[in-house]
């Protein structure tokens, strides 16, 4: 049983970093916001999707599928080669994404290039431990085993991985689920269109009205 608390602001995508004092999101206008534990700060730039890792690494993509990485020392965005529609950051070492053709990519931070992964996904998420899950156009769920993607029981349209023990997602009916013991999906109360889980089980999400909610697993 989780207790959802409504949070101030409006977003369409939200991401949890090291904790509830490092929350990033974008709204339906592409505006970027950072919650520091006390208030929302508007950040320069425009993005349609954003993700933050446990180490504070922030990446995003814009409506033209351009990819950006934030330098948090000066709050400036640096463009990264390639094109994606969604990006996921577990940490500096773990960045994945998908493009408009459902192609899957893994960032090689040693050589600053994208490696294409076999398969087709519309949404992907990587945790700080390198755990990767994703969903495809048919709402099927897949897990990366280090060399290939394997089908997982269940149906979702969006999934978020903090680590192997903390995985949440939503389906096409806005129902919210958490993965227990790596195999059982537990339905949570509430309705959300996007959900994100942090290292300590803090969950943030948004609904179809762009309202923001938070809870703890």
From Swiss-Prot:
6 X approximate tandem repeats: annotated segments: 2-217
UniProt keyword terms in alphabetical order: Cytoplasmic vesicle, Lectin, Membrane, Repeat
Swiss-Prot/TrEMBL Sequence repeat ranges: 2-37, 38-74, 75-111, 112-146, 147-182, 183-217
InterPro entries, alphabetized: Beta-propeller_rpt_TECPR, Tectonin_beta-propeller
Entry's Gene Ontology cellular component terms: cell surface; cytoplasmic vesicle membrane
Top-rank taxon, per record: Eukaryota
SUPFAM superfamilies with a match to the protein in the record: Calcium-dependent phosphotriesterase
Pfam families per UniProt: Tectonin
Entry annotated with the keyword Cell inner membrane: no
Disulfide bond residue pairs: none
This protein's record includes keyword Membrane: yes
Gene Ontology MF terms: carbohydrate binding
Localization (cell): Cell surface; Cytoplasmic vesicle membrane
Function: Probably involved in bacterial recognition. May be a lectin that function as part of a transmembrane signaling complex during phagocytosis.
Family named by the database record: Belongs to the tectonin family.
Name of protein: Tectonin-1
Species for this entry: Physarum polycephalum (Slime mold)
Gene name, Swiss-Prot/TrEMBL: TECA
């Amino acid at each position: 049983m989780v207790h959802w608390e409504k949070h101030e602001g409006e977003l369409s995508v939200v991401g949890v970093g090291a904790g509830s004092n490092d929350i990033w999101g974008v709204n339906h206008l592409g505006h970027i916001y950072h919650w520091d534990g006390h208030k929302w700060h508007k950040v320069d730039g425009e993005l349609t999707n954003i993700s933050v890792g446990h180490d504070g690494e922030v990446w995003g993509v814009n409506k033209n599928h351009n990819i950006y990485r934030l330098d948090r020392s000066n709050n400036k965005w640096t463009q990264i080669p390639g094109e994606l529609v969604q990006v996921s950051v577990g940490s500096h070492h773990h960045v994945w994404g998908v493009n408009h053709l459902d192609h899957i990519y893994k960032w090689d931070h040693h050589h600053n290039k994208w490696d294409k992964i076999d398969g087709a996904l519309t949404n992907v998420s990587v945790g700080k431990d390198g755990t990767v899950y994703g969903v495809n156009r048919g709402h099927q769920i897949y897990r990366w085993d280090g060399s290939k993607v394997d089908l997982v029981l269940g149906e979702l349209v969006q999934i978020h991985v903090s680590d192997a023990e903390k995985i949440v997602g939503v389906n096409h009916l806005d129902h919210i689920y958490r993965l227990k013991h790596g195999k059982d999906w537990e339905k949570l109360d509430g309705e959300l269109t996007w959900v994100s889980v942090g290292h300590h089980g803090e969950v943030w999400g948004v609904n179809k009205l762009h309202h923001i909610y938070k809870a703890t697993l």
